[in-house]
From Swiss-Prot:
Belongs to the PsbX family. Type 1 subfamily. One of its GO terms (biological process) is photosynthesis. Pfam families: PsbX (PF06596). This is Photosystem II reaction center protein X. It comes from the Bacteria. The keyword Ligase does not apply. Involved in the binding and/or turnover of quinones at the Q(B) site of photosystem II (PSII). PSII is a light-driven water plastoquinone oxidoreductase, using light energy to abstract electrons from H(2)O, generating a proton gradient subsequently used for ATP formation. It is a single-pass membrane protein. It is found in: Cellular thylakoid membrane. The keyword Thylakoid applies. Keywords: Membrane, Photosynthesis, Photosystem II, Thylakoid, Transmembrane, Transmembrane helix. It comes from Synechococcus sp. (strain RCC307).
Length: 40
């Protein structure tokens, strides 16, 4: 694996974490605070 390829993969992982982690935290917080009774 070339250093540039390693840097590219690392940037992809970092970008995914930067996007996914805040969205996951926000969804968990919203689902915890939103106590609407959902009847499916």
């Amino acid at each position: 694996m070339t250093p540039s390829l390693a840097n590219f993969l690392n940037s992809l992982v970092a970008g995914a974490l930067i996007v996914v982690v805040p969205i996951t935290i926000a969804l968990i917080l919203i689902s915890q605070t939103d106590q609407v009774d959902r009847k499916l």
